[in-house]
Amino acid sequence: MFTDNIKTMGTNEDNYNVTILIAEDEESNFLLLKTILKRHCNVLQARTGLELLKVFEEKGADLILLDIKMPEMNGIDALKEIRKKDTQIPVIMQSAYAFENDMEAARAAGSNGFITKLINIVELKNTISKFLPQITW
């Protein structure tokens, strides 16, 4: 696992064929995800639910990692808005708390998956690979 962390260090040159939009209001959580992903795909950030909708509309993405607890608009409501415009994009919900009611609300809103924080790198990569098999880890 330590080598996984080292392997993901580097810069994002915006030349990958895949873009992942990370909707995360906690900067440390975003930086962790970005560090893991940036050598494999383009990474976009949204810090609020409303910013997520704007970034997605303006730039698009191939997959969204979406925190359930977001300011201005929570992740479930943001997902419902995304599903009104795009029913196909994979959306993986994240939460620090794996409450069954959160997972059920995420599924009902159209989530494609659910991961918990603290991030398990293997679980994250496996979940993303289900929807974006072209990413090479």
Label each residue range with its predicted role.
Residues 45-63:
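Acidic, metal-coordinating helix/loop segments flanking the phosphotransfer/catalytic sites
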Residues 1-21, 42, 122-137:
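Non-catalytic signal-transmission and effector/linker regions of two-component phosphorelay proteins
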Residues 26-44:
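Two-component/phosphorelay signaling modules centered on CheY-like receiver
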Residues 48-51, 74-77, 110:
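Acidic catalytic/metal-coordinating carboxylates
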Residues 70:
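Receiver (REC) domain active-site loop signature in two-component systems and cognate sites
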Residues 54, 76-87:
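Short amphipathic alpha-helix used as the core "switch/output" element in two-component signaling
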Residues 77, 98-115, 126:
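Alpha4 helix (beta4-alpha4-beta5 surface) of REC/receiver domains from two-component response regulators
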